[in-house]
Amino acid sequence: MRMLPTNQIWRYWSFETFLEDVSALGVRDVDLWLCNNHVNIDAHGAYNTDEVVRGMRRHGLRAMTLTPEQGNPKAYNVASEDGEIRRLTLCYYRQIVRLAAALGAERISLNSGWFPFDADRDRAWDAMVSMLGKICRAAAEEGLTVALETLVDKPYRLVTSLETLGAALLDVGESNLTVTIDTGTVARNGEDIDAYLSRFGSELGYVHLTNLSRDIFAHLAWGDQLGGLDPQDLLRRFACAGYAGDAALEMTKPSYFERPRDVLSRALTTLRGCEC
């Protein structure tokens, strides 16, 4: 399994520092989170594409995955019923597809969006399915896959379980739409990794290898003593299922923001100690 650090905990640092830190730790492949501090992109353009491409190449790095900013209160929402938000959302993802092509990325990592508590779930579901289909078709033009993850049920209430993830894949019906298993989210939702591996098999296109504490609503780093998941057991399960693809190391706990390089170094050391 290839581990892809993300720039999420570098959000208060420059993009150059992120590039320097991960390359110094021997990393070559990353999941690039599209925060505007690092990648200046919106529905109308990707304004620093050349700078991002040059920086990645200068440090010998590859962006294998692009992860948009998504979810409330972000501006773009794949489940919105509002016509103008839908137009801008699709334009945003078309810009991401162009950026992915410039970077030589393989996939876009998505979630199912959100809808207001006082809105109809079925209408939001239909809006989500329609938008995911459009995004998948745009991505297919550049040979990209789209990897869809589950979220926690509250407050998202759309794709939040094995069953709703399977329903989304079936309803969208695009061959380049694949499954992301987020280990921390699956555990937080009380589900079983093996059930996902058994259900989706060849449809598994990506992994978020995340740790968790049930008392902290964040993705914890491997090596954080508050984390409750066993990385060696998880890696064994994926290996037994034949998964040898990419795994993003998403870490979002705010206390990591001041020392992101140290947090990533500890996580990589922990995971390397679990390899067979």
What is the predicted function of each stretch?
Residues M1-N7, Y12-G26, V53, R57, ...:
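Histidine-acidic metal/acid-base catalytic patches
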Residues I9-R11, L34-N36, E69-N72, S112-P116, ...:
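Active-site-proximal loop/turn and secondary-structure-junction residues that shape catalytic pockets
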Residues L32, A63-P68, A105-S112, V146-E149, ...:
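Short beta-strand segments at enzyme active-site cores
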Residues W33-G55, S112, P116:
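Glycine-rich, proline-tolerant flexible connector loops at the mouths of alpha/beta enzymes
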Residues W33-V39, N77-E81, E250-T252:
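Glycine-/proline-rich flexible loop or hinge segments
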Residues D42-T49, D82-R86, D118-W125, L158, ...:
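Flexible, glycine- and charge-enriched loops at secondary-structure boundaries
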Residues V52-A75:
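Short hydrophobic interaction/assembly module
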Residues R58, A75-T178, R188:
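Active-site acidic/histidine proton-transfer and metal-coordination neighborhood
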